[in-house]
Amino acid sequence: MANINIPDDLVSKYSEDVKDLTQKAGSIPSSKSLIPQTAFTPDELRRSLKFWQVTTKVAATVASDWTNLATALTNGTFSATHLRTLCELAFNLKAPTGTGTIFIHEIADPWKGCIDANAPDTVAIPATDSDVNMSTVSSGSTASGTEDAEVKMKAISFLCCTLLRLSVKEPSHIMQAINSIRQRFGSLYGVSSPTLNSVTFNRSQLSRIKQGIETYPSARGTVFYYTRYADATHGYTTKEYGICRFLLFQHLELEGMHIYKMLLALLGEWSTVPIGLLLTWIRNPRSKLAINEIVKIVKELDKPEVDKGWKYARMVNNTFFLDLSSRRNTYLCAVLASLNKKNVPQGSGEYADPTNIAVIKNMDQSVKSQVATDVTLIERIYEKYLVSAGGDEAGTAYALSRGVKRSSPPSQEGGQSGQSGGTPMEVDGASGRGAAGPAPKKTRSGL
């Protein structure tokens, strides 16, 4: 099949009976069966948003509220009322030093109209997992005496913030992360908490929390609003930002915007490549809408002076940024995932393999093979760009090992250039900038 010649004129030649049908899919209404994307604007975001206002709680109230919430989880009576309490406990999180809170603030006028003042219902939220075996374990440490009330308050809020990851994570995430949560609390706050060390959950309990967040828009809106506020308020170098980054930011930001998230990760490693050039290398005929959305984000939204709400907006309205989802860009998603796996340091557990997602695993093997070919070509293009772009980014060994040339430094008098007669060394694939001597050889990685 690969040897069959296809004449150029046949590619654009219509059959006689369909020669007038020049429409493309975009102009045929019935072809648009996908849910339409909602264009993101701050006003459109606020029109969709409802959230519960969080006010300051004292340590004794935090402790008693947690006891009631934990009892409801154990008894199967956990409701939207308890879910609101969970949000209130989470966003009463104290700063590591001093007495201030990280999230609570005076709500600005543009957001006041989004506050949901109605009392949540008390109907029990159903569990979506029947496993009632304890899936998280106690650390095994025992308390010596009564736990300090302020320490207990900080630990409860820290734990509740972690539970709000269930907005986007599965119960298994909490079960796997519980030891890390305990350790990080100790390192951030400089103290250990018996309450945090002894807490346990099962899948059924955690599934009620997740189901509640998915059911009640005001719950998602509350997580969105206070996360957005913290991201916009605390500078990158502060301890407050570091805590929020660990607890929420890294898990919630750019959720569902897989294409942009993986693109940023790759750019972090290929930092000398302009984003427009990288997009040119990786795009394909079906990626136009995703590329357009990325251009808009880079030009209008992903800027220091712009409110961070866009990063978390899909928690409020999941039709925002749909054109950046993996399901609408399966091929581009596979290319970026493979590039990330090969070039970006990966985490462990659920973060270990960016290609381990359904839309990629379900691809036909022939398509996966084509993706692998594209990825190899993109990496070769990058290597050639890195060396040919000049500067010191590509070291001598890096250039030599890839068969791409670098221009040598000018020769010095007395044969100090390292070659007899003062002739500059030729490196395979040299561009010829400032080089003398023999004509360059054909590059091994040239395209």
UniProtKB/Swiss-Prot annotation:
Family stated for the protein in its record: Belongs to the nucleorhabdovirus nucleocapsid protein family.
GO molecular function annotations of the record: RNA binding
Record-level GO cellular component terms: helical viral capsid; host cell cytoplasm; ribonucleoprotein complex; viral nucleocapsid
Keyword flag Ribonucleoprotein: yes
Protein name (database record): Nucleoprotein
Annotated compartments: Virion; Host cytoplasm
Function noted in UniProt: Encapsidates the genome, protecting it from nucleases. If expressed without protein P it binds non-specifically RNA and therefore can bind it's own mRNA. Interaction with protein P abolishes any non-specific RNA binding, and prevents phosphorylation. The soluble N-P complex encapsidates specifically the genomic RNA, with protein N protecting the genome like a pearl necklace. The encapsidated genomic RNA is termed the nucleocapsid (NC) and serves as template for viral transcription and replication. Protein N binds protein P in the NC through a different interaction, and can be phosphorylated.
Taxonomic path: Viruses, Riboviria, Orthornavirae, Negarnaviricota, Haploviricotina
UniProt keyword list: Capsid protein, Helical capsid protein, Host cytoplasm, Ribonucleoprotein, RNA-binding, Superantigen, Viral nucleoprotein, Virion
Domain of life: Viruses
